[in-house]
Amino acid sequence: MLTIALPKGALLKDSIRLLQSAGLDFSAFLEPGNRQLQILDRQERAKALLVRNSDVPVYVEYGQAQLGVVGYDVLREKTARVAQLIDLRFGGCRMSIAVKASSPYRSVLDLPAHCRIASKFVHCARDYFHNLDLPVEIVPLSGSVELGPITGMSEAIVDLVATGQTLRENGLVEIETLFDSTARLIANPLAYRINADGISELIEELRQSVTQAIAATC
C-alpha cells in the first residue's frame, strides 16, 4: 500500500486538499481533537503519516513513505536523498536575512566580518555566507530567532518570512532574500523508479491538479 508523509502545521490543509483532487481523502487529520498520526484513505487505497515538516524527507528517504509533501526550505536544509517531483505552488514564503531596523546594516555586505547570525536553518545560513566568502559565526536556535538581534546576541538572523508581520512587530527589517520556498512533492528514489504501488499514476494526477489550479488563476 502506498504511504504518503504529510507535514503538520501550515502546509497540512492544502496538502490534504491536493490529495483529495486525486481521490485520496485524509481529511480526518483536520478533525477537531484528532490525535491519530497514521490513517487510511477512506477507500483504503493509501495510508498517510502525519509528521513534523522537517521529518517528511527523512521518512521518504528511508522508505517508510513513498511520497511526501514538504517545504523547499526543509529540502535545502536537510539535503535528503529524495526525488523532487512537483512544485505544488502553495505554502509560499522566503528565506531571508533580517536585522534590527535601527541598525546601520541595509545590505548583507554591510555586515561586519565574524559577526553572529542566529538561525534555525544552520546549513542554509552557513552555505549562503560561505558562498559570499563572508566569515560569520552561525548561532543555532530552535525558535524565536527574532530575539537574537533584539537581545544583542546576533547582528542578524536567517529565517523564513511569509508576510513579514512578525519581523515588523519586533523591530526587524529584511535586507536580503536567500531563496523563495513553496511546498514540493517528493518521492523515495527507488519507489519512483520501479513505480511501486502505482506511484506514477498518482504523481501524474497530482501534476494535472497543480496545472489546472495554475491555469484557473491566470
Curated annotation (Swiss-Prot):
PROSITE patterns: ATP_P_PHORIBOSYLTR. Keywords: Amino-acid biosynthesis, ATP-binding, Cytoplasm, Glycosyltransferase, Histidine biosynthesis, Nucleotide-binding, Transferase. Gene3D superfamilies: Periplasmic binding protein-like II (3.40.190.10). Pathway: Amino-acid biosynthesis; L-histidine biosynthesis; L-histidine from 5-phospho-alpha-D-ribose 1-diphosphate: step 1/9. One of its GO terms (molecular function) is ATP phosphoribosyltransferase activity. The keyword Nucleus does not apply. It comes from the Bacteria. It is an enzyme of class 2 (transferase). Its EC number is 2.4.2.17. It is found in: Cytoplasm. Its main location: cytoplasm. The keyword Phosphoprotein does not apply. Pfam families: HisG. One of its GO terms (cellular component) is cytoplasm. It catalyses: 1-(5-phospho-beta-D-ribosyl)-ATP + diphosphate = 5-phospho-alpha-D-ribose 1-diphosphate + ATP. One of its GO terms (biological process) is L-histidine biosynthetic process. Lacks the C-terminal regulatory region which is replaced by HisZ. Heteromultimer composed of HisG and HisZ subunits. Belongs to the ATP phosphoribosyltransferase family. Short subfamily. Catalyzes the condensation of ATP and 5-phosphoribose 1-diphosphate to form N'-(5'-phosphoribosyl)-ATP (PR-ATP). Has a crucial role in the pathway because the rate of histidine biosynthesis seems to be controlled primarily by regulation of HisG enzymatic activity. This is ATP phosphoribosyltransferase. It comes from Synechococcus elongatus (strain ATCC 33912 / PCC 7942 / FACHB-805). The lineage of its organism: Bacteria, Bacillati, Cyanobacteriota, Cyanophyceae, Synechococcales. The gene is hisG.
